């Protein structure tokens, strides 16, 4: 029917216009065993003067993820250089009535020209954290 064809065309157009993102993050609270939702995360770039410049601020979703840092549409538009993510963990733990040692966590990393996507996960507890390059 015409409705089905129209819906299929709309779906294809949405898919073709979907923005891809070069950087994502995920926070898992290993104290509770749950994703850490509503955590403020700031993204900074180290400029040519060796100064940190804030380029984005987002909050983790219910699943503890932010999937949409650094949008790009073509290979030549990929960002590269030194970046850092700043996770406001104390605010998260205050909202859960838990004492925490770290007021925030900063993770610095380098994006290379030849890499498509970077994922920076954090496993977090009130008195420790771990991170790695995910996929």
Language-model regions, residue ranges each:
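N-terminal secretory signal peptides that target proteins for export/translocation
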Residues: 1-2
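Sec-dependent N-terminal signal peptides
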Residues: 5-15
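Beta-strand-dominated extracellular/periplasmic modules and repeats
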Residues: 19-110, 119-121
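Compositionally biased low-complexity segments at domain edges in trafficked proteins
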Residues: 115-135
């Amino acid at each position: 029917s015409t409705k089905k064809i129209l819906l299929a065309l709309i779906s294809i157009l949405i898919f073709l216009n979907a923005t891809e993102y070069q950087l994502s993050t995920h926070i898992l609270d290993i104290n509770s065993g749950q994703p850490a939702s509503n955590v403020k995360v700031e993204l900074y770039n180290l400029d040519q003067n060796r100064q940190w410049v804030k380029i984005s601020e987002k909050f983790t979703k219910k699943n503890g993820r932010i999937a949409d840092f650094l949008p790009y549409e073509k290979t030549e538009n990929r960002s590269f250089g030194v970046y850092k993510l700043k996770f406001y963990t104390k605010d998260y733990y205050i909202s859960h009535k838990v004492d925490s040692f770290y007021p925030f966590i900063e993770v610095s990393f380098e994006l290379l020209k030849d890499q498509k996507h970077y994922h920076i996960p954090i496993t977090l507890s009130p008195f420790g954290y771990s991170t790695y390059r995910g996929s």
